[in-house]
């Protein structure tokens, strides 16, 4: 028996919409990362992009557990000595809620060209409940493991 390797003509791409309202950030990000990478499909091939498109709505209403809302920070560095920037989670969520989910999903993807390509092409995040991808007729997805308890 030979090992199956997907070819571009075999891949059937679908669109999904996920409502992030009341969901835990990390659990939601791990499920979304699986879908945009294609690991939920039996034809998953590590060296190819077999994933589906995911639209995340209500990004501004995502939740974190524990005291992460006050304690979590995002780190960046300008390249100059002493120019570290630590941005609190609450301020990023208030100004750019899309970036919170994008950064969480990026952290769960491989740091390769394929991982960056999958994130850039397959993930669409919106702060509110509206999105412009109605024409793709996305199917609604729910994750019971990501819901806040």
From Swiss-Prot:
GO cellular component: cytosolic large ribosomal subunit
Gene3D superfamilies: Ribosomal protein L13
Domain of life: Bacteria
Keyword terms, alphabetized: Ribonucleoprotein, Ribosomal protein
Keyword Ribosomal protein on entry: yes
UniProt-recorded Gene Ontology molecular function terms: mRNA binding; structural constituent of ribosome
GO BP terms, alphabetized: negative regulation of translation; translation
Pfam short name (any one): Ribosomal_L13
Family from the record: Belongs to the universal ribosomal protein uL13 family.
Job of this protein: This protein is one of the early assembly proteins of the 50S ribosomal subunit, although it is not seen to bind rRNA by itself. It is important during the early stages of 50S assembly.
Subunit structure: Part of the 50S ribosomal subunit.
NCBIfam families to which the protein is assigned, alphabetical: rplM_bact (TIGR01066)
Protein name as it appears in the record: Large ribosomal subunit protein uL13
């Amino acid at each position: 028996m030979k090992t199956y390797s997907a070819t571009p003509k075999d891949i059937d791409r679908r669109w999904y919409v996920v409502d992030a309202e009341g969901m835990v950030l990390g659990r939601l990000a791990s499920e979304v990362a699986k879908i945009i990478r294609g690991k939920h499909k039996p034809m998953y091939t590590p060296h190819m992009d077999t994933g589906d498109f995911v639209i995340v709505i209500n990004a501004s209403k995502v939740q974190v557990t524990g005291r992460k809302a006050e304690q979590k920070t995002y780190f960046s560095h300008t390249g100059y000595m002493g120019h570290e920037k630590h941005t609190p989670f609450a301020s990023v969520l208030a100004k750019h809620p899309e970036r919170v989910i994008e950064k969480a999903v990026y952290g769960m993807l491989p740091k390769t060209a394929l991982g960056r390509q999958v994130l850039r092409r397959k993930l669409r995040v919106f702060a509110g409940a509206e999105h412009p991808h109605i024409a793709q007729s996305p199917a609604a997805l729910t994750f019971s493991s990501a819901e806040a308890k």
